[in-house]
Amino acid sequence: MLILLNTFAELPEAYKAFAPTVDVLPLIPLFFFLLVFVWQAAVGFK
């Protein structure tokens, strides 16, 4: 099972150049979550 997961954990050779971008992609939803608090702070948590 671990070998199967490791197979999916690595990008195919053709996509190795995009590895830095793929590493950042999971953080994008967190930025939106933080944006909600910044937005609400700007409007006074109405």
Swiss-Prot record:
Q: Which UniProt keywords apply?
A: Membrane, Photosynthesis, Photosystem II, Reaction center, Thylakoid, Transmembrane, Transmembrane helix
Location of this chain's protein in the cell: Cellular thylakoid membrane
Its predominant location is membrane
Any chance you could tell me the propeptide residue ranges? 1-9
TM regions (residue ranges):
25-45
Write out the GO cellular component annotations: photosystem II reaction center; plasma membrane-derived thylakoid membrane
- How is this protein named in the record? Photosystem II reaction center protein K
Q: Which HAMAP family match?
A: PSII_PsbK
Single Gene Ontology BP term? photosynthesis
Similarity-based family: Belongs to the PsbK family.
* One Pfam family per UniProt: PsbK
Q: What does the UniProt function comment say about this protein?
A: One of the components of the core complex of photosystem II (PSII). PSII is a light-driven water:plastoquinone oxidoreductase that uses light energy to abstract electrons from H(2)O, generating O(2) and a proton gradient subsequently used for ATP formation. It consists of a core antenna complex that captures photons, and an electron transfer chain that converts photonic excitation into a charge separation.
Q: How does it sit in the membrane?
A: Single-pass membrane protein
What is known about its subunit structure?
A: PSII is composed of 1 copy each of membrane proteins PsbA, PsbB, PsbC, PsbD, PsbE, PsbF, PsbH, PsbI, PsbJ, PsbK, PsbL, PsbM, PsbT, PsbX, PsbY, Psb30/Ycf12, peripheral proteins PsbO, CyanoQ (PsbQ), PsbU, PsbV and a large number of cofactors. It forms dimeric complexes.
User: What domain of life does the UniProt record list for this protein's source?
Assistant: Bacteria
